[in-house]
């Protein structure tokens, strides 16, 4: 909820905001006025702070205390506690609280408890009492301690309650904060955060936001990247994208003397963070130094195996995980068990039971932990996800493992990244690591009786096709049958065992979420439509092979959907969720399967001239489904991408031919434009061209090359000479050979990947730069002939230049161009008329200008066209003061997608596609690869 502070904050001008910066722990001279003036010129997205408003310049910073036992809803029949205590009682409370903090005597603590049980009261900074001001002083000192203990670049800010009208909201305006002076983005995000207020007792996600959820539930919440949230879950999402904010953790702050939550500490950073244990530990120690508390965190000690039976069970489980992962190349498999309880601080002072994770939200409820039990990792990249699992826990019904635990049946989900955070607390990490298919099964051992062991297997990230997933699942089940000795599959009800058949697996569908959610890449942002409802379907395959729908709806927050039309978000880990199963014999509607059956090849051909994404949008399917439909029709690659590549080859060949004196009269080339008239099969386009008859080849003059994706296609260029030229077999072979030579340095783009998708993270890194705007490489026809510079005769036939003396003009490209140059040494060397082609100018100059963006930094330097990727990375690393190997470089391809530069062939194609002497690149951090290739504990 975004609230205008000028209309809601009382007592303006009575308190001052402070911050902690570098240099001896001195407070930064940041108040609301200074910050607003600093960023009054910030771009319109997000909106700048209102510099002219005087009513919010220095809002008060109250901290409030209340006893939960007396906190009654306003609409309840019972009389509510008075908003403020009488003066005498309030004075007594202040005196007792102050005395308690000084001596911590049992007598004074009991006195405070007695007053708390009688009155609901609020202590504010603006009442000028020593006790109320002490809250802010202690928080400020705690942040000083934290600043001294960390060297990370981050923003730490405090959210504290303030009265707005007749209710209380959380605000960070006027509260202490720690800020890295080097990060302008975090400073801007701090200024934006001061404009927000969040409810302390709201009933929907939009009102609560991240600070409100943490304050209300009194448990931490964290994510590797806030851009995985929806805008409902995280109202500051657009600002986070604009200012390159990623990792965030929010912790409740308790005052043990009054047993209440008094504030929320939020840690914000511009890098993606997987493990927050170190930061949380430092915050907790800093708070303890000033007699405040937060969620405790302990190192995870190895579980002591107290009997041989448990040890034998874990050894057998480890064997199963290892065999299945190694045989089927699964990236990760792990075990969840009902967690061991320990005592932690809960609700500010009460001792409750919690699991080993530092979340601390289970409060004695049944939950599962994956720490210190058997697991197996094959893909080293998944160690980060494994570490995140250790820090989290799952309650009954959360994630695939939680559902296997509560349903007592094997469960499978085709795409766990489609869950909401409430249904699967690890969903942000699943999106970050590109995980999709997941299978879980609950086992018991004859050695340990009723002890449950939930085995969780993650399918390879590239295994997303439904048929491939089903085949792999069947193979996993068959292998597990052979491995089970003392372990048995947990049955449902009176059934002791469930046969390991795919017909007995519960298929967890999230179709309601799929229709409203999409991701821009495997690491990209979360987007949702307003109508998403957060329900999900569970399908059971009966003995006849038919799916039985089991609807499992989570009624988590009353009237949430009706009031907010957003995803319900209550407790971050879903402890308030309740499962209700409604069985139905009616098979569920599968929108994706229906679309696949109805989209024919004839329909697809109508969209071949445009981009795949635009075609998918027009047909009402996602790009992934569109690619699957193409594969079913034998189309391995979207045609317009191939046409673009052929056109680039034609342009090269044209320049080679023109370098021979008098060749302009004999040859006339043009790009391939117009709608695609011939079916595209599994064979390559070049083979189709070779086999095509002269009449069919003549029709190719009307083929269209994809231009600007958001603009209309260019008019077909008519050229009769193309049919004559293209009908000759020799030209086809020459064209293919030239392309082969240009691509021989591993030009398959395996590392670039046509599936690479433009992430909002990447766009945010380039915010404000031209590369972030709609910049798409134009077709060769237009890049070689700018309309405003070329005569009318040239625009009609873009590749036919005026009959002027020609000199040698060859592109120094991969091998073939240099070799061909030697064939024309006898050509007359005459002055060459400079073309309008940016590509030609770039190659003639021998150098290009590189503009590389990294977070808020942009570096610019000249680079030789013949340089290698290694040399390019060295130049970037030297200027950004980074280590080579710790970052990736990406370029914007002709589909407006950020593609990784992995080899010299990618760099060559980048220069081809750019068509300009200025090449813009994006530099991003490499995800941490932790640990070795496999491991286990038990």
UniProtKB/Swiss-Prot annotation:
Xref: Pfam families: GAF_NLP (PF22922), PB1 (PF00564), RWP-RK (PF02042)
Annotated ranges, domain PB1: 847-926
PROSITE patterns xrefs: PB1 (PS51745), RWP_RK (PS51519)
Domain RWP-RK positions: 585-666
GO cellular component: nucleus
Predominant location category: nucleus
The keyword Cell division appears for this protein: no
Amino acid composition bias (Basic and acidic residues), ranges on this chain: 580-597
Bias type Low complexity, positions: 748-762
One Gene Ontology term of the molecular function aspect: DNA binding
Region (Disordered): 1-26, 557-597, 743-769
Ranges in a coiled coil: 640-662
Domain of life: Eukaryota
Purpose: Probable transcription factor.
Protein name: Protein NLP3
Organism ancestry: Eukaryota, Viridiplantae, Streptophyta, Embryophyta, Tracheophyta
Gene responsible for this protein: NLP3
